[in-house]
Amino acid sequence: MLIFPLINDTSRKIIHIDMDAFFAAVEERDNPALKGKPVVIGKDPRETGGRGVVSTCNYEARKYGIHSAMSSKEAYERCPKAIFISGNYEKYRTVGDQIRRIFKRYTDLVEPMSIDEAYLDVTDNKLGIKSAVKIAKLIQHDIWKEVGLTCSAGVSYNKFLAKLASDFEKPHGLTLVLKEDALCFLAKLPIEKFHGVGKKSVEKLHDMGIYTGQDLLAVPEMTLIDHFGRFGFDLYRKARGISNSPVKSDRIRKSIGSERTYAKLLYQETDIKAEISKNAKRVAALLQDHKKLGKTIVLKVRYADFTTLTKRVTLPELTRNAAQIEQVAGDIFDSLSENPAGIRLLGVTMTNLEDKVADISLNL
């Protein structure tokens, strides 16, 4: 007996676009001498005493087992000839904006998931093109021609399958999953490839003898619910290719923030305040991009011993003014008890967000 009703809308046309090794690809585009060489976006451990982590890397570096969140030291040990680049996040954001403008030519139903990936609902698109595959190919062509980068695309009738499809053939691939092929497509996938199934859930599923989509499909609904609660029903639906989550062009954001981890610890107040200023300006720019205002400013400080402090101040009025955000974040820092340990991370976040209701100038 089904505990929750199964409703499977297969009429939609959803595309998931995922840029290929985005940060590294931008660096290769701007410096062709990097092509064919292992490129790592992160601090060079030879310059930082082994500190720092990998933000991302290109496909050449991935051949050595390098991946995001790996320590820069380990990345260097795996591939001493790797080229380390600190990264230019303002440049990446500008390129990301350029790519999103391309998406908007085809549909306004664009849901960015990060700077380098997005869902598009092209069921009713601006150009009246019936084939979602054709639109995906046009987008790939436009991005290559105008931005000089490649992307992978997944096409299906829901977001879950479209994302799995975009991961199936990288880089610069295009995979279509039709409703009649969905069960076969899912059956062959390792369960850890299922989007939304975290590491702990994977371990639990493995303990139950579930390793593939085919294994998951054979498990009764009540068994999954007994082991995972409501998430068990989600797993039951995923195994059957069912997901009716809409593409939300205006995703509700609860906060907008900017934080940075430092390979070299910060001790001097002038350096600390300068980094707070950079984060504040980044937050103000993001608020501008998303047409949001905020009331509560949060400062996050992590020290060398990994002690982490967060403190917030709620303003009387909404703002997205960079100077005001910087001032308040700086005042919050001044109010913290002195800690002789150096600072390894600083973050500034704005919460209590509302849509822009007035033309408030952005002072950078």
UniProtKB/Swiss-Prot annotation:
The active site is at E117. GO terms for cellular component: cytosol. The keyword Phosphoprotein does not apply. SUPFAM superfamilies: DNA/RNA polymerases, Lesion bypass DNA polymerase (Y-family), little finger domain. Mg(2+) binds at D18, D116. It is found in: Cytoplasm. NCBIfam families: PRK02406.1, PRK14133.1. Monomer. Belongs to the DNA polymerase type-Y family. This is DNA polymerase IV.
